[in-house]
Amino acid sequence: MRHYEIVFMVHPDQSEQVPGMIERYTGAITAAEGTIHRLEDWGRRQLAYPINKLHKAHYVLLNVEAPQEAIDELETNFRFNDAVIRSMVMRTKNAVTEASPMVKAKDERRERRDDFANETADDSDAGDSEE
């Protein structure tokens, strides 16, 4: 089986349907005896240029190992699902399991924010004890 990186963009008004779509697509891959190596829901993001008069879309990234038939079925599902405004399937040499740069940056921002919140909480506790 080959490795693939799949990115699809969902209409922003259909964002609440994304978890169901992810479940359906991953189910189709696992039913064909494929494996999901990475699944990232990037959420609603600004588009580089308008697509169908839309300026935002909900992004999802999948790295899978699956037979060609499963990928063909997935592409057909993307094509006939009106909520999917763009999709891209690329074959890769190896399975990619590490977090993408987008997720790494998001995690770093979250860690910095949490560290800052902890520091300010410690500073306010220290200030209270001096009184």
From Swiss-Prot:
The keyword rRNA-binding applies. Residues 104-116 have a biased composition (Basic and acidic residues). The keyword Calcium does not apply. It comes from Enterobacter sp. (strain 638). GO terms for cellular component: cytosolic small ribosomal subunit. Binds together with bS18 to 16S ribosomal RNA. GO terms for molecular function: small ribosomal subunit rRNA binding; structural constituent of ribosome. Residues 98-131 are annotated as: Disordered. Belongs to the bacterial ribosomal protein bS6 family. This is Small ribosomal subunit protein bS6.
